[in-house]
Regions:
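Generic beta-strand structural signal
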Residues: 95-97, 156, 184-186
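Short, cationic motifs built from Arg/Lys/His that form the positively charged side of catalytic pockets
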Residues: 9-13, 151, 202-204
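A short secondary-structure junction signal
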Residues: 110-114, 165, 199-200
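N-terminal amphipathic, basic helical "cap/leader" segment at the start of enzyme domains
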Residues: 1-108, 215-221
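A glycine-rich helix N-cap at a beta->alpha junction
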Residues: 70-77, 176-202
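Phosphate/diphosphate-binding glycine-rich loops and adjacent basic-rich segments that engage nucleotide
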Residues: 199-221
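Small-aliphatic-rich amphipathic alpha-helix that forms the alpha element of a beta-alpha
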Residues: 29, 33-34, 99, 105, ...
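Short, flexible, mixed-charge acidic loops at enzyme active sites
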Residues: 64-65, 111-122
């Protein structure tokens, strides 16, 4: 059952840097996730740049995300507060595989190309200005795909976590991914966890760290 799969999900603190999945294992996980999700008109107007095992680069990525987090706090008027490392980001430093999800330009498949030609419609996903107007839709679809990847990874005995604290400046990403064309939507890591975030919480913090209720999230009307 899907519940049993996702009950294993925990936010990673540190990945095991010795027990590293092979690229073939990761490719298998990514391949299995594709048919488990969906996209409007099968556009899949997104891609993930997969950064493989490289501890030096992973540490630089953590440093860059921490710097962005500190800068963001400064913009919120908290520049005088001390900068404390965020344990929620630590998984970036040891992740053997890091997926940088971004939008991508894409042409329609043969089926939808014929349909758009027949009705003289305009395909929106193959030019930058139209694509960026669809960022919300693309972000939702990335979320669906990345969650399926997490599920397959969990079923494979691995772990996966997410990060939303990073720079939105495209130029900041060129040193990591020279060919990147759009700012990231989300960062996802995959590997074998060595420790989890919940393990560093005090008993009081664990009690306070609650999920919203069903009443908070759903309203029957």
């Amino acid at each position: 059952m899907i519940e049993n799969t996702f009950k294993k999900r925990k936010h990673v603190l540190h990945y095991d840097t010795k027990d590293i999945p092979t690229q073939e294992q990761i490719t298998d996980i990514l391949s299995k996730a594709i048919p488990l999700t969906t996209s409007k008109q099968k556009a899949f107007a997104f891609k993930a740049f997969v950064l493989g095992p490289d501890l030096a680069r992973s540490n630089k990525l953590l440093t860059a995300c921490e710097a962005s987090n500190t800068e963001m706090n400064g913009k919120l008027g908290e520049r005088n507060l001390p900068s404390n490392p965020n344990p929620g980001l630590y998984h970036l430093a040891t992740a053997p595989y890091t997926l940088i999800w971004t939008p991508r330009l894409v042409n329609p498949n043969t089926h939808y190309k014929k349909k758009f030609m027949k009705k003289k419609g305009a395909w929106e996903m193959n030019n930058s200005s139209s694509l960026l107007k669809c960022e919300t839709q693309i972000a939702i679809e990335i979320g669906m795909m990345s969650k399926m990847i997490m599920g397959v990874a969990l079923d494979s005995g691995l772990d996966s976590s997410f990060c939303l604290c990073y720079s939105r400046k495209l130029s900041d990403w060129k040193p990591f991914i020279p060919q990147i064309e759009f700012s990231p939507t989300i960062i996802q890591t995959i590997g074998k966890a060595k420790s989890y975030y919940w393990e560093i919480l005090t008993p009081e913090e664990s009690i306070d760290n609650t999920n919203p209720t069903i009443e908070d999230l759903f309203k029957f009307v």
